[in-house]
């Protein structure tokens, strides 16, 4: 499951990778236009509080590359970008007048929904006790 993440600093990349560097595919882009050029007409879901569609609605097909863009916690994705993605903008339902979830929680929720739609390929589906048997 390749991850493409846009970070603003080297420090953010190192913090996000922790001890999983051998499992990450980090790609760097100059800006959003650079990302679009290098990823041959990608289907992008824009995760935003401004969206009309709930994150669980898309099919996230098994054979499609799924790109989900999240904005900064403080500002979100610029509206100039969102204008071109009305149908693929998605949101996590929230109670009215309640601040949105933090970015890491939002990424986890949406990423696992995509993985669920795609059958959790390559994921361990069963756990086991360490000191006892079921």
What do these predicted regions represent?
Residues 84-134:
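Structured adenosyl-cofactor binding patch, chiefly the S-adenosyl-L-methionine
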Residues 12-79:
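S-adenosyl-L-methionine/SAH cofactor-binding core of RNA-modifying enzymes
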Residues 8-10, 133-134:
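A short beta-to-alpha transition loop/helix N-cap that caps and shapes the active-site region
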Residues 8, 79, 83-86:
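Mobile beta-alpha loop/short-helix "lid" or hinge segments that flank ligand
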């Amino acid at each position: 499951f390749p991850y493409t993440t846009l970070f603003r600093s080297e420090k953010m990349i190192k913090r996000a990778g922790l001890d999983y560097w051998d499992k990450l595919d980090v790609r760097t882009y100059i800006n959003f236009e650079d990302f679009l050029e290098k990823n041959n007409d990608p289907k992008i879901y824009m995760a935003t509080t401004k969206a009309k569609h709930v994150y669980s609605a898309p099919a996230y097909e098994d054979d499609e590359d799924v790109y989900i863009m999240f904005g900064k916690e403080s500002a979100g994705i610029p509206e100039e970008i969102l204008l071109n993605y009305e149908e693929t903008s998605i949101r996590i339902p929230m109670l009215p007048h309640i601040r949105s979830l933090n970015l890491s929680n939002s990424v986890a929720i949406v990423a696992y929904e995509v993985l669920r739609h795609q059958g959790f390929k390559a994921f361990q589906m069963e756990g086991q006790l360490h000191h006892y048997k079921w």
